[in-house]
Amino acid sequence: AQNLIVGADFATRFDNREYANNDFNESQTLFSARFTPRIGVEWMEKNRLIFGVDLLQNFGQHNGAREPFLSDVKPLIYYQFNSKNVQANAGIFDRKELLGDYSRAFFSDSTAFYHNRLSGFLGHYKSTERRNTYVEMAIDWEGMYSEESREMFRIISAGRYTLDKGFYFGYAFSMFHFAGKIGNENVTDNLLVNPYAGWEFNAYFDFDIKAGFLFAPQRGRSVDHNWKKPCGAQIDFVLTKWGVKLENNLYLGENLQPLRNIAVGEDIPITYGQDGLYAGEPFYATTEHI
């Protein structure tokens, strides 16, 4: 039997950023809305083929006489296999399909919202015996070799095992192949590994306390052929009640983005940071060890 699937997602984002004496980011307000209608077909209870459109409007964005109706319009189209324990996606699908707990050293909250589609493959296994216990891997093809775009792809993976009484441990991993484009043939390898452990418990509020290690080996082949190996530790504290969440992230360690302010080429006045090498929060480029 075949079933018709119809649905839609709606999300807004308001992010007011005010900084003083900050070298990493600019003060600004990000205010956007996204509407994503979907339609698809399901057969044999486990197979789905989904088509959708991602409609984004940045509030206050203007482009003169050529102003578009919307800030961005992009497709969603993917096949999904879904069973009791296993899910696999292939095509262009929403980032929300990921299960992994990825530190903002991997993806900033802005990256997660504005680069919300993955183009490639996702597979994960989720336990039905233990809560929040899973393993996943995904490949996101982010750029095609051309004059306008680098050839880029990212392999990500995450896993978590939840023990009794709320204790858990897990990992997150990313390998970003940041290759060249026509006129700028340099290649950069950028890896990030994050093993962690934590404890979830309730004491009137819901608490989640997690500590992890961040290791970021990377090599800019146009800069030199030496691997840079910065590392550090991160402690996350989350308090939740009545649908409201307070979160604090503390990073202690070395600059995880050492190529951020280095030019991508001798005759190219663009830094690796401006060119998109790092998807994580710029604050991880701290040189103050905190």
Predicted regions and their residues:
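Exposed, low-structure sequence patches enriched in small/polar residues
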Residues: 11, 132-142, 148, 156-163, ...
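Transmembrane beta-barrel architecture of outer membranes
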Residues: 28-38, 48, 70-78, 116-122, ...
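Surface-exposed coil loops of outer-membrane beta-barrel proteins
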Residues: 87-160, 175
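Beta-barrel outer-membrane channel/assembly domains of diderm bacteria
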Residues: 1-71, 75-81
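Residue-level signature of outer-membrane beta-barrel architecture
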Residues: 39-43, 79-83, 125-127, 161-163, ...
